[in-house]
Amino acid sequence: MNFKVRVIDLAGSCCRLGALQFGTKVVETPGCLIYNRSGVVPHLTPDILETLDNVPPIMHTPLASIIEEPGLIKLRGYGKGLASFIGYKDNSVYISASDYQGEAMYQYNENKSISVWTKTGRTKVTPDDYSKFVEVCRPSWYQSLCDTVPANASIKRTRKSVDRTLEFLDQCLKYREKHDSLKTSELWAAVEGGGLVDERQRSAKESATRPVFGFTLEGFGSDQMNVETIFELLPLTTQNLPVEKPRLIHAIGSPTINSLSRSSKLTEVEEENGNDSSNDQDRTATFSLLNLREDRYNEDFSPLVSGCKCFVCSNHTRAYIHHLIINNEMLGGVLLMTHNLFQYIEFFRCIRTSLKNNKWKELRKLFDA
C-alpha cells in the first residue's frame, strides 16, 4: 500500500490532493468510505452496491458490529478473511475500534482494555484480543485500539485517554511486529485529546513518532463537540502530523466542507479527469431536505434532484418513492440510499475537481450562500 500526496496552496490556505493505492485499487482523497454494520450497508445488498458507479473500494466496518457475529471462531474457521465472508470479494475492508453510530460509554474503558458494546452487552477487548481478531479478518487497514472521550470530559480523564491510547498503539505495534500475517494490513494510529488543545497536540506528536501508515482523528463525531470547537481543534491537531501520511476522520457530520477547509486538509488526490465540473458543483452544492412522507409528493412526477444522473433519478419519481415509503415497502429505503450514496460520492468528487482546477473558493461560496 502506498500514498501519494500533493499539497496545493490556495491563497495561503493549504489543501491536499492524494491517492491511496493498495493493489489495483485506488481511493482518491479527499474522499469517503462506505460504512457498514456486520458487513451490511444499510438497505443495500452486495449485488446492488456493485451496480453503483465510483463507489470507494473499501468498506468501513466497526469492531462492535462483527466481534460477536460472525466473531473470531467463525472467521478463523472460514479462513478467507472478512471481505470474502460478507460477500465483498472485490472490495477491501477497514476495521475501526470506534463506532459513532452507537452511544459512546467511555467510562467503562480501563487501563488494559476498552469496552465494546454488542447486542448481548459489554465485551472487554485488550490490544492483543483486538489484534488476534484483526488477524483473522485480513483487512487492508485497521485502526489502533483507542480510549475515546467526549469534548466535555475532565482534564484528568482526557489525559488518561491519551496515555491509554498511546499504550494501546504500542501494544498493537508490538503484536503486529511478531505476526507476519498482519504485515499486509496497515495500522492507523488513533489521535485523541477530547476538547483540549494541548492533549490533541500531544497525542498527534507522540503518534507521529510511531511507525504507522496513517492517522485517525477521534472524538469529532461526539454530540458534545460543537462546530466551533471542531474548527479550532482540527488545524491545531493536523499541523503536528506528517504531511506525507494520510488522515481519516470518523463521523464529521454535516459541516464536512467547512471541516475540510479549516483542517488544512484531512486527506488528499490526483484526479486524471481535468474536465470542468462547474455545472456539477452547482447541482451538488444546492440542496434541500425532502420529507417524502408528505402528501404533497403523491402527484410529484419529478426526480428527487433535477439533473442528477443516478439510477434512481433517471428511472423513478418522487411520487413513486412517496408511495413506497408510506406503504413501508423495502424498495423505498433501497432507492433513497442509492441516491444519497451517489450524491455523497459526487460531493467529494466535486471537491477534488475544484482543488485541482483552483476553484476551491468558488465551491465554498456555493455552500456558504
Swiss-Prot record:
Q: Does the keyword Cytoplasm apply?
A: yes
One GO molecular function term? metal ion binding
Q: Which residues are involved in binding Zn(2+)? A: 308, 310, 313, 339
Query: Where located?
Result: Cytoplasm
- From the UniProt entry, list the residue stretches annotated as the region Disordered: 263-282
Is Iron-sulfur set as a keyword in this record?
no
Required co-factors: Zn(2+)
Q: Which family is annotated? A: Belongs to the queuine tRNA-ribosyltransferase family. QTRT2 subfamily.
Q: How does it assemble?
A: Heterodimer of a catalytic subunit and an accessory subunit.
Stated role: Non-catalytic subunit of the queuine tRNA-ribosyltransferase (TGT) that catalyzes the base-exchange of a guanine (G) residue with queuine (Q) at position 34 (anticodon wobble position) in tRNAs with GU(N) anticodons (tRNA-Asp, -Asn, -His and -Tyr), resulting in the hypermodified nucleoside queuosine (7-(((4,5-cis-dihydroxy-2-cyclopenten-1-yl)amino)methyl)-7-deazaguanosine).
Q: Under what name is this protein listed?
A: Queuine tRNA-ribosyltransferase accessory subunit 2
* Source species: Trichoplax adhaerens
